[in-house]
Regions:
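Structural signature of tandem alpha-helical TPR/SEL1-like repeats
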Residues: 22-30, 56-68, 90-102
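Structural marker of alpha-solenoid helical repeat scaffolds
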Residues: 4, 38, 72, 89, ...
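Alpha-helical segment of the N-proximal tetratricopeptide repeat
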Residues: 6-38, 55
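Terminal, low-structured helical/coil segments at or just beyond the last alpha-helical repeat
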Residues: 2-5, 9, 97-122
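Residue-level recognition of tetratricopeptide repeat
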Residues: 17, 51, 85, 118-119
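Start-of-helix register in tetratricopeptide repeats
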Residues: 10, 44, 61, 78, ...
Length: 122
């Protein structure tokens, strides 16, 4: 295990954000794994890792991370929305609907509301 400090963890987290923005989810995952090993309670790092798993099409791992974030922060609208997108991508639309609706209820942003409404139609 490499030596980590709060500073190196922040640098790794920020670099992982940049890699995700550059569409390099695997690179982001490599940076985030040691951060989460050192700080498993860090919800922001877990949320970023869940997004990386999603972009890497590792849907089961993404689902597990988003679920963990929701367990810790049940009012995190983005986590519900992202979990819904993950479930939708895995063709689990019935499960996705619940999380789209929760996201819209927690934060009535237009994209969340649109997704919740869209998912209600047959």
């Amino acid at each position: 295990v490499p030596n980590t400090s709060p500073e190196t963890n922040v640098i790794a987290y920020r670099a992982a954000e940049q890699l995700l923005d550059a569409r390099d989810p695997r690179g982001a995952l490599k940076l985030l794994d040691p951060v989460i090993t050192a700080h498993p309670e860090n919800t922001a790092a877990r949320l970023l890792r869940a997004r990386a798993f999603f972009l890497a099409a590792q849907l089961r791992a993404a689902e597990q991370e988003f679920q963990l974030v929701i367990e810790r922060e049940p009012d995190n609208a983005f986590a519900h929305f992202a979990l819904a997108r993950t479930l939708q991508r895995a063709n689990r639309n019935a499960e996705a609907v619940r999380h789209f609706r929760l996201a819209a209820a927690l934060d009535p942003r237009p994209d969340y509301l649109e997704a919740a409404r869209f998912e209600q139609s047959p």
